Amino acid sequence: MSAKQSSNKIFMVEPREFYSNPQTEGSNHYQMKSANDEKQLILDKALIEFHNFKNNLEKNGVEILCLKGIEGCPDHIFPNWFTTFEDKTMQIFPMNAENRRKEKTPEMINKLCEIYKIQNDFSYLELEDIFLESTSSMVFDRVNRIVYATPSPRTNKQFLNEWCEKNEYDLCSFKTVSHTGSDIYHTDVLMYVGTEIIGISFDVIDEKDRDRVKKKVSLNHKVLEITADQILDFCGNSLEVEGESGNLMLAMSSRAYSALDTEQKDILLKHYKKIIHSDLTTIEKYGGGSARCMLSELF
């Protein structure tokens, strides 16, 4: 069993470009289109938000490994193409959008290989239109070896099953419905797993699967229920991080923090020393992702 759920070390990518990715808007119903003439303005705002968030995490004792993105990768700010493990191995995953596949740069892989050994590189599956977008597709309960996942155009059901079986994770798979009536594109939109508490929106889980998921998440954790409306404010896109002395904190956007009610915040603060939040308005608006999407744990 894994010794810990969260990490003190986080990987982030400072984007070279940032705008609404036309290659992902078909499945990501949380991003807004951007006009070409707005690109520089959007990037400038996103960079301010990025650095403020990074500085906020570092100020609270989180160690950040930050690399710079490349041209042609508007979603480089969301490094969810790999996963690391406590045995110092890493796995690289198949991405749906072509410009997201380019995010796996030799420089980034080489840097990660200074710490981790590549156990599997599943990029070849992209040629077969089989996708499983790492920690966005799969929400890990690392301590209890459970993967939570909702199949979608970016999360192939068969490969998800195969991966969990080979890596000895118990899979809890369920169908979801977004505010548009389609599948929610990434599982980390609707839930996160902490050491003591799981935040999840049962409202967006299909009724046939809901009770089963409720039982599963309640086995080892306190559960914080998030509403469907709060999902639109990215309340589910949060991540537990470790500060100095192993203090556990929850990272999210200021929009998500503002959308939580007083009771929810009080519950979270029983399990966390602090809720770290930063303004990610531009990144959320045009990227369709929030705090968790920007952070990849280094175990």
Language model region names:
Residues 1-299:
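The feature marks the mature, well-folded catalytic cores of soluble enzymes
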